[in-house]
């Protein structure tokens, strides 16, 4: 596409140049792209222009600064405010995909993937954009919600491949930072709101308002709200013009624990939901409501609820053992995961391995220590992603919430902690490895190292 068309309604240029893509990140930049140099959290994109040129960018857009470089540079005042226009101008077929957004502290990934699984069973082409990457595309992401150009590029690819529906995890950061700007969602789904990300939002009110953006104006045409969450009235009020649909666990006529999950009745259907944890009842009901809003009926949807499977790293049982991996990295998620194991193994001792991320919400650390003390019989504290923080200082914050009489070990090396716990695990003990779930790296200092809870645990089981 000619750069004049990309810059339409933004800035005039006499430049004639063919462009193959837009990029905010030199790590994902491809030959023929325009590099958009913005101020980031720590550095300005200008610092990466030479690297972008080396990788084949054909032009640079710069925010309010003149910069001489080996490719054409175009100054765009208030560049960040024009990102959605740039994306819409270039990725013109992205708008052809029907979009569903899922927001909430916990459950975004599970609900998104349950919707996708149901649509797969119903032979409806779909994709998921979120924590586990972007399905049915080669694009990858390290964020729950990727940057705006990556999203539009993926939607363009979906459209070209006749993928008609995309489910997007809408994080609070993405909603605040405009990464979903210009998109229109047929549905917005709210799962729950509990403490997280207060390093960024500062207060729970700010955090709630960030999530609420999904339901304002014409961002979402329909709203599907979890009425079991104590914040549900705020989201109902925010989405009142959309005739919101509410859901809750009491939509089930009954449910009871089974060996593999739950025996449930929904409307006139009795089935086994093969997912553990009451939170997964809520997640599955959210997915059911979403797919029903797409025009499918109970006869089509409910039989497939019995075939759902958890996403990687979400209450994932390893090799039919008593060892479970979960992404739980918030107080509420840790509470849910440990409570689930307590219910699943009523006669067992429950052990948990976890830590907390560095340079992130410090207020939740003591809370998570307290929850582990109350829900588990023994605790191993270890590194999560310490980033730039002192690992022992993070552990000390968690310890402030534990009880003196608790059985607590500290093994900072996460691999050693997992191996030690598995090697000493008794026949009537269950182990939860919490915090990283599906992740395949660990961030220590400023470097990202290959690391997988799942791989380390499976290796220790051999």
Please provide the spans of the model-predicted regions.
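Short internal beta-strands
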Residues: 58-64, 223-227, 353-354, 377-385
């Amino acid at each position: 596409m000619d750069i004049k068309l990309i810059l339409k309604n933004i800035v005039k240029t006499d430049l004639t140049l063919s462009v193959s893509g837009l990029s905010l990140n030199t790590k994902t930049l491809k030959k023929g792209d325009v590099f958009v140099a913005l101020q980031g959290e720590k550095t300005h994109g200008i610092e990466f222009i030479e690297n972008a040129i080396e990788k084949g960018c054909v032009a640079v857009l710069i925010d309010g600064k003149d910069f001489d470089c080996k490719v054409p540079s175009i100054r765009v005042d208030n560049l960040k405010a024009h990102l959605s226009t740039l994306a819409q101008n270039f990725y013109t077929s992205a708008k052809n995909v029907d979009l569903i957004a899922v927001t909430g502290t916990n459950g975004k990934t599970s609900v998104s993937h349950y919707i996708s699984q149901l649509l797969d069973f119903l032979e409806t082409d779909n994709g998921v954009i979120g924590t586990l990457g972007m399905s049915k595309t080669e694009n990858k992401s390290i964020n729950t919600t990727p940057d705006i150009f990556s999203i539009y590029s993926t939607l363009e690819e979906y459209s070209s491949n006749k993928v008609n529906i995309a489910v997007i995890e809408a994080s609070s950061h993405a909603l605040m930072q405009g990464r979903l700007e210009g998109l229109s969602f047929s549905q917005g789904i709210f799962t729950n709101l509990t403490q997280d990300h207060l390093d960024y939002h500062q207060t729970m009110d700010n955090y709630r308002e960030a999530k609420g953006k999904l339901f304002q104006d014409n961002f979402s045409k329909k709203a599907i709200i979890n009425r079991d969450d104590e914040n549900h009235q705020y989201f109902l009020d925010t989405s009142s013009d959309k005739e919101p649909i509410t859901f809750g666990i009491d939509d089930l006529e009954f449910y009871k624990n089974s060996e593999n999950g739950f025996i449930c009745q929904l409307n006139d259907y009795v089935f086994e939901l093969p997912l553990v944890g009451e939170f997964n009842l809520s997640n599955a009901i959210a997915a059911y409501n979403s797919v029903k809003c797409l025009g499918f009926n109970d006869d089509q949807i409910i039989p497939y609820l019995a075939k759902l499977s958890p996403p990687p790293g979400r209450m994932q049982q390893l090799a039919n053992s008593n060892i479970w991996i979960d992404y739980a990295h918030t107080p509420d998620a840790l509470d849910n995961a440990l409570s689930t194991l307590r219910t699943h193994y009523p006669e067992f001792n429950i052990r948990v391995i976890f830590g907390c991320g560095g340079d992130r919400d410090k207020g939740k650390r003591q809370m998570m220590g307290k929850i582990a003390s109350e829900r588990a019989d023994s605790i191993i504290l270890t590194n999560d992603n310490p980033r730039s923080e002192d690992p022992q200082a993070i552990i000390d914050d968690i310890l402030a919430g534990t009880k003196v009489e608790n059985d607590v070990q500290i093994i900072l090396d996460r691999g050693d902690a997992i191996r030690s716990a598995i090697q000493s695990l008794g026949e009537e003990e269950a182990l939860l490895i919490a915090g990283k779930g599906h992740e395949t790296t660990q961030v220590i200092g400023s470097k990202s190292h290959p690391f997988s809870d799942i791989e380390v645990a499976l290796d220790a089981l051999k």
